Amino acid sequence: MSIVKGNHDYICDEEFDDVYGFVSNDNQFDWGMHSHQESQLILSPSGCITVNLQSQKLVIPPNCAIWLPPKIQHSIERRGGESLVTLFFKSSIGYTVPNDLRVLRLNSLLIALIQRVSYASNNRQFHPSLIELLCYESYQAPLTDLSLPLPTDSRLLAWLNSLEEYAPQKLGVMAKKIGASEKTISRIFFKETGMHYQEWRKRWLLLKAIELLSEGESVTGCALTLDFSTTSAFIYFFKQAMHTTPSQYRKYFE
């Protein structure tokens, strides 16, 4: 299995069977950039995780999991919840598994299969039919898009870093802060992310809202942090995107 030692030292034990589960209960969970030789299926049963790639950010709520192919550089932060679950899949596994990065919507069967493997830490032997079903359900699971492509233009680096503290401004305000025209900013965003800036900003706000809710923030607190004019405006925005209210969505994290 892949295990964690101090200072983000990752080790692979090649003796494990086709699939091995790893559960972390570290309250200060934050793994820096690293990669693995195995494919991974990662989820937080009662919290959410933020996965950062070199040019993309993904937020994974507890009703979803992320599939990471081998050798992809990534960092992981767990937000809320009591544990993080990772399944490692050997590249030599004899069953069909996803070969691309994807976010899976979990059903009750897939959740049960993941729990069966991940929490059996003292039992490395699983019946082949169980592993086959786990791989099949992972491959066939419906997909969802909770990702945010990141621009790489050097003019935007300082601004992107500031988003750790402040929500992205509307285009006119942001362009003045950067010192570029709205047309230039719009062109950069569409070229490098495939999204218009306002679309990108809405996606950022949505993912940040999910992170805040997972950390126990109130709906009103989310609205204030994300600079919505009213709590009602935030609720409307969230419901348009997620087809449920923020209060209802918070139940995933309870």
Residue ranges: model-predicted function:
Residues 55-70:
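Short acidic-glycine-tyrosine-enriched beta hairpin
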Residues 1-48:
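Generic protein-terminus/edge-of-domain signal
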Residues 95-164:
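Amphipathic alpha-helical segments enriched in hydrophobic/aromatic residues interleaved with Lys/Arg
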Residues 63, 185, 189, 233-234, ...:
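Short hydrophobic/aromatic patch on the recognition helix
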Residues 191-231, 235, 251-254:
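Terminal helix-turn-helix DNA-binding modules in bacterial transcription factors
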Residues 72-101:
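Ligand-binding loop in jelly-roll beta-barrel domains
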Residues 2, 7, 236-254:
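…primarily DNA-binding HTH/wHTH and HhH modules…
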Residues 142-178, 195, 199-218:
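A short, Lys/Arg-enriched amphipathic alpha-helix from helix-turn-helix/homeodomain DNA-binding modules
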